[in-house]
From Swiss-Prot:
PROSITE patterns noted in UniProt: RNA_POL_BETA (PS01166)
Residue runs in coiled coils: none
Main location: plastid
Keywords: Apicoplast, DNA-directed RNA polymerase, Nucleotidyltransferase, Plastid, Transcription, Transferase
Official protein name in the record: DNA-directed RNA polymerase subunit beta
Catalytic activity as recorded in UniProt: RNA(n) + a ribonucleoside 5'-triphosphate = RNA(n+1) + diphosphate
Biological process, per Gene Ontology: DNA-templated transcription
Molecular function terms from GO: DNA binding; DNA-directed RNA polymerase activity; ribonucleoside binding
UniProt keyword annotation of DNA-binding present: no
Record EC number: 2.7.7.6
UniProt subcellular location: Plastid, Apicoplast
Length: 1024
């Protein structure tokens, strides 16, 4: 544990982590203030001899033996008091536990052993808002006065009436004011109020201001309250209402004709604000208890010491708070992206259906603060967005961003503007270079001011923001993002959060500036905290000897469990004898390669048809990818087995199992535990667990004779081995044996020993897996071709994958064509390109066309020996079976591809005729219940591509809701009965209904011969 006298404010990469440190500082400040207040209070009959505030950081999970269950990092605030009570003439010293808060660092909070992420919220500010609209050709004004959290007053103003809604009650506020004015205030005020309502010149706030300013007499207000008490049974409502209205500050600023959900009327809100409200409330209770401690000293001291009630309320509030979400840890990018999530509206889940589309659209006034593209899918589309990369929070809880002056070489300073202040400037997204630039002769520039685009002259009032600042972190990783459809870019962002880290990644040939390590990455790396020399490096730890001759050990915990069960491996990048400085990176994880974000490989892509397997979204790959392990990923399964003591009889592990063959126990040691390094398959024994049962027999004399002969009590033992499943085909990489007293020192249970078996699983690329590129183009592997069966060029170059040619124009992601052209050029030149997303910002639109034309020509000249087409970047391939030239040419590109987490091994399973629902007669859902799998549109396309007509028949008949056909199939399989003709299923009837909706009528007729040997058609109703 660590004792902290004063928490030091260290700048963090995330907003909520910095606010958490400020929260601790404010709690300490309030505690000191209350102690000084009580010490100077006359009514207090005790003196403070000594006090001290201790901040205790405990339960640190560094170097912990428990690598599965992440221990909650707790921050405890303890107040040590030494009081001298005057009445009893005694000095009492006691320690009071004020708060227990989970420690928040880098927007990560560990609750119940799980990683969770804190997200942000845009919340309505405490102001006055006005909404105007027409109802039955009548103008109605709604005035919302937000006082505090959950407290608001609503006025509905029509032409001659004002209705007030407060505390679930509705009443006529105008009649109330007129009635009160007639009794206590001048009667001329009523005429003044009436005229102003008709003319619509002032609002209800002005009435209160007028009354309060003209008759600013406390006695009048008190008499007014006394009258309202006698008025009716709802007196408390009016008292609270007038108290609130009279206490409103006169310098309130409000905006007319603005919606409540306007971005100007919102402020930043997070879990820290909720903790601040709870902490202030509890500190006031603590102050009151300390103030009245002298009445009953011993009872009040016990109340102070036993304050678990308030601590548990705060901890429970954090657990159920919707701003604390389950962390997405598929890769580092998905975790970073979730930390920048922000909710734009504060409505509940039930009201997302009825929200207007205007609230979902991204207004222009938040350009640079909220990402242009990145948002959620589904019901929360446009309501949950993500912050940009370079955004900060000021002291007024408003987002600010840095702007440069357009002539920043002359005016070398930056402007820090919020969402409202930036409206006073003309903002340009393209920089101007004064020297050696074609823009030198330009006098006008495109800018945005007050949410409108306009062309204005170049003046000093223009500020500049790079276009990368308008995008989120993931969007800046996509090269040529301008040339893709925005919806396809959104899909690409979601795919980046589903990428699985692989064992052997390669650096991308086409990158952006955001591929390198940024500040946001430093939270996932191991960094040196002192200057020194490396004296030892291994895959387990790094030892550094610092300037004070101390050995500092950095452990690389490669078996740490994360939420998605992906094995995150740390690799040292320093060597023995190297001098390291403060802040230098010592080790990186498997998401990085050479200090760059890289999770995929460069593949040679052929856009064309190959045996029809590339139908729709299907992808054909070469077996060379499997031989080189280009997309092999590591996953970690952990078995946690405990040995219990049941009825004072312990469970044991032994290799002496009854009714077991040698092949089942050959990988076990003498204690019945599987050996490290063993490659296990499905249904292998991991631990042989024996449970002893008492022998129950009615003849006690026989039992006594047996016990006398064998010298021990007769018992029955039962085999309960732990067996691996089909998802555990891998290698045992680590085994831990933990006694109970090492990891569980507080709770008393029947567990006396615990085993942990770590199984490393290599998942290779196989049929059914999904791969994607950086432009939102994903597909399922439909065929793995042999190397000898793939078409080739004259220089023996073969494409790695084949994709349908119509997949690019149908998705409008032209950016992958540009990436493929430059990637192919970089492959020939053995170079890499750092691409700016906006290539035309300084050179007009012709720059990109000329550059592409040059790259096309270079690629053609490099492949001068290959058979080229008349079109650029298109090649003729040879048939691998005949060696002849294939008639049509195809396009070849070099594109960076990833592997997604949607792997067929985790989802695909075998199921025969299983359980069906009694109501719908459809297969039940759920893997644990052996339920049915969803057979969607893309699966139907795959069956159509393979021509699986018999499989279609099974889905429409035997595996559908046709009960009779299912029974016929069951009797055929189990009882060897003859299979009969199938009946008409409900699925087939539904297809007929769908065809009838398309004006396609399908009828059935029974054809037979009549008495005159003429054919007649008898219609048959096949639907009912």
């Amino acid at each position: 544990m660590i004792y902290i006298v004063n928490p030091i404010l260290v700048k963090n990469n995330y907003i909520i982590s910095n606010l958490y440190l400020l929260l601790i500082q404010e709690i300490i400040y309030n505690l000191r203030y209350y102690i000084l207040f009580l010490n100077n209070n006359i009514n207090v009959k005790f003196n403070f001899i000594y006090y001290k505030i201790i901040i205790l950081l405990t339960n640190i999970n560094i170097n912990s033996i428990d690598t599965i269950q992440n221990i909650n990092n707790l921050l405890k605030i303890i107040l040590t008091l030494k009081l001298n009570f005057i009445n009893i003439n005694k000095i009492i010293k006691f320690n009071i536990l004020i708060f227990i808060l989970p420690f928040i660092y880098n927007n990560i909070i560990i609750l119940n052993g799980l990683y969770k992420t804190c997200i942000q919220l845009f919340k309505k500010n405490n102001k006055i808002f006005i909404i105007k609209f027409k109802n039955n050709n009548k103008n109605i004004i709604y005035v919302y006065i937000y006082i505090s959290l959950g407290l608001r007053i609503i006025f509905k103003i029509s032409k001659l009436n004002i209705d007030c809604y407060f505390n679930n009650f509705k009443f006529n506020f105008l009649i109330l004011l007129l009635y009160l004015n007639n009794i206590y205030i001048n009667k001329n005020i009523s005429l003044f109020i009436y005229n102003n309502i008709i003319n619509k010149k002032i609002l209800i706030y002005n009435y209160i201001k007028f009354i309060y300013s003209k008759y600013n007499n406390i006695n009048n207000i008190i008499s007014l309250k006394l009258f309202i008490i006698k008025l009716n049974k709802f007196n408390n409502i009016y008292i609270n209402l007038l108290n609130i209205l009279f206490s409103i500050k006169l310098n309130f600023s409000y905006y007319s004709d603005f919606y409540i959900n306007n971005i100007y009327n919102k402020k930043f809100y997070s879990i820290i604000d909720n903790l601040l409200i709870k902490s202030k409330k509890y500190l006031k209770i603590f102050k009151y208890q300390l103030l009245n401690i002298n009445r009953n000293i011993y009872n009040n001291i016990t109340l102070l010491l036993n304050n678990k009630k308030y601590i548990n309320i705060i901890l429970e509030n954090i657990n159920i708070n919707p701003l604390v979400q389950y962390s997405d840890q598929v890769n580092n990018l998905s975790e970073i992206n979730q930390k920048f999530k922000i909710n734009m509206i504060t409505t509940g889940l039930n009201s997302k259906f009825i929200l207007n589309n205007d609230l979902r659209e991204l207004p222009r006034n938040i350009l640079g603060y909220i990402s242009l593209i990145n948002t959620n899918e589904g019901l929360t589309c446009g309501l949950v967005n993500y912050l940009t990369t370079n955004i900060f929070l000021n002291l007024k809880y408003l987002f600010v961003i840095y702007y440069k002056h357009i002539f920043y070489n002359r005016y070398n300073f930056k402007l820090l503007l919020n969402i409202f202040n930036k409206n006073f400037y003309n903002i340009s997204f393209n920089n101007i270079y004064l020297k050696k630039n074609i823009n030198f002769n330009k006098t006008t520039i495109l800018t945005i001011n007050k949410n409108t685009f306009k062309i204005c002259n170049i003046t000093q009032n223009i500020i500049y923001i790079p276009f990368n600042y308008l995008l989120s972190f993931i969007e800046n990783l996509i090269p040529f993002i301008h040339y893709n459809d925005s919806i396809r870019n959104l899909m690409s962002i979601k795919m980046h959060t589903q990428i699985v880290p692989i064992i052997y990644p390669n650096l991308s040939n086409i990158i952006t500036n955001y591929n390198f390590i940024l500040n946001k990455y430093l939270n996932h790396l191991i960094i040196s905290y002192q200057e020194g020399i490396v004296i030892y490096v291994s895959c387990i730890k790094i030892i550094i000897r610092d300037l004070f001759n101390r050995q500092i050990i950095y452990y690389l915990n490669n078996y740490k469990k994360i939420n998605q069960n992906i094995l995150l491996i740390y690799k040292p990048i320093v060597w023995v004898g190297e001098k390291v400085n403060i802040g230098q990176i010592l080790a990186i994880n498997s998401n990085l390669l050479n200090s760059e974000y890289s999770l995929g490989n460069n593949l040679l892509v052929g856009y064309g048809s190959y045996l029809g397997y590339e139908y729709e979204d299907a992808i054909i790959i070469s077996r060379k990818i499997l031989y080189n392990n280009l997309y092999t990923s590591l996953h970690l399964n952990i078995y946690e087995i405990s040995l219990n003591i049941i009825n004072n009889i312990p469970e044991i592990c032994s290799i002496n199992l009854s009714k077991m063959y040698y092949k089942n126990i050959k990988h076990l040691d003498k204690y019945g535990i599987i050996k490290e390094g063993t490659y296990i398959l499905a249904n292998n024994i991991l631990i042989s667990k024996l449970m002893f049962m008492p022998f129950i027999f009615n003849n006690k004399s026989l039992i006594n004779i047996i016990n006398f002969l064998f010298g021990s009590k007769l018992r029955i033992f039962k085999n309960k081995p732990i067996i691996s499943t089909i998802h555990d085909i891998g290698r045992v990489i680590k085994i831990e044996i933990l006694p109970n007293h090492l990891y569980n020192k507080t709770e008393k249970n029947n567990i006396y020993l615990k085993f942990r078996i770590y199984i490393g699983i290599q998942k290779y690329l196989q049929l059914g897996d999904k791969i994607c590129n950086r432009h939102g183009h994903k597909g399922i592997i439909s065929y793995i071709s042999e190397i000898n069966d793939i078409p080739y060029l004259n220089n023996k170059i073969q494409p790695d994958i084949f994709i349908s040619a119509i997949s690019i124009p149908s998705r409008i992601n032209i950016g992958q064509i540009f990436e493929g052209i430059y990637g192919l050029n970089s492959l020939y030149l053995n170079t890499r390109y750092i691409i700016s997303n906006n290539l035309n910002k300084n050179y007009y639109n012709n720059y990109n066309h000329i550059f592409n034309y040059y790259k096309y020509n270079y690629n053609n000249n490099f492949n001068i020996n290959s058979k080229m087409s008349y079109n650029y970047n298109k090649y003729y391939l040879k048939n691998p079976f005949t060696g002849n030239m294939i008639n049509n040419s195809i396009c070849l590109n070099n594109i960076y591809y990833y592997k997604l987490i949607h792997m067929i091994k985790d989802k695909f399973r075998y199921r025969f005729i299983g359980l069906y629902s009694e109501l719908t007669q459809q297969p039940i859902k759920g893997n644990t219940k052996q339920g049915g799998q969803r057979f969607g549109e893309m699966e139907v396309w795959a069956l159509e591509a393979f021509g699986a007509s018999y499989l279609f028949k099974e889905f429409f008949t035997y595996k559908s809701d046709d009960i009779k056909s299912r029974k016929i199939l069951k009797n055929y399989l189990f009882n060897n009965y003859k299979i009969k003709n199938t009946f008409i299923s409900e699925t087939f009837k539904l297809i007929l209904k769908e065809l009838q909706s398309l004006a396609i009528n399908i009828e059935a007729f029974c054809i037979f011969n009549d008495t005159n040997n003429l054919l007649e058609n008898l219609p048959i109703n096949i639907i009912y």
